[in-house]
């Protein structure tokens, strides 16, 4: 995990979190000047993407296949598909501290999309979708335990908080590459799956 560096969706932080042990290991890795193969670079990029969004290998392969069939740059379409997942939107809005926490909110039926309960974390949000919390005590308590973080909301989303303190999110438009918080070269992931997809 430490080798994959900063994963904002998994750790909930935007900054790298290294301990003394990690710094020591980094110094040892740099001192041994091994040549890293292209396969290793692609595999690491794939693992970073998969772990950040909390996907299984099969799910990521399915998203790559969908991105290949869609018009446009395969890498950018892949990131767009992953960023528009409901669990990621909830994380980006600050309703959950991590993507796994957002997934739990969705699976426990605390989230409404366009005033309907959605319990599928991989639900693909569309422009003009309204994301809110169910109006029941357990849903309010679940959200209170996940304090609304002070992170900036990306430009493709809008967050408004009512007088009662209930957050409501709006998807303005599809996400663009500049709004993605993850530092990754998505083309390496596409190249990794070039023979499988």
Swiss-Prot record:
SMART domains: Ribosomal_S4, S4. It is found in: Plastid, Chloroplast. Gene3D superfamilies: Ribosomal Protein S4 Delta 41, Chain A, domain 1 (1.10.1050.10), RNA-binding S4 domain (3.10.290.10). Keywords: Chloroplast, Plastid, Ribonucleoprotein, Ribosomal protein, RNA-binding, rRNA-binding. The keyword Oxidoreductase does not apply. GO terms for molecular function: rRNA binding; structural constituent of ribosome. It comes from the Eukaryota. One of its GO terms (cellular component) is small ribosomal subunit. SUPFAM superfamilies: Alpha-L RNA-binding motif. The keyword NAD does not apply. CDD domains: S4. Its main location: plastid. HAMAP family: Ribosomal_uS4_B (MF_01306_B). Belongs to the universal ribosomal protein uS4 family. One of the primary rRNA binding proteins, it binds directly to 16S rRNA where it nucleates assembly of the body of the 30S subunit. NCBIfam families: PRK05327.1 (NF003717), rpsD_bact (TIGR01017). A slightly longer form of the protein may be created by RNA editing; however this region of the cDNA has not yet been sequenced. This is Small ribosomal subunit protein uS4c. It comes from Adiantum capillus-veneris (Maidenhair fern).
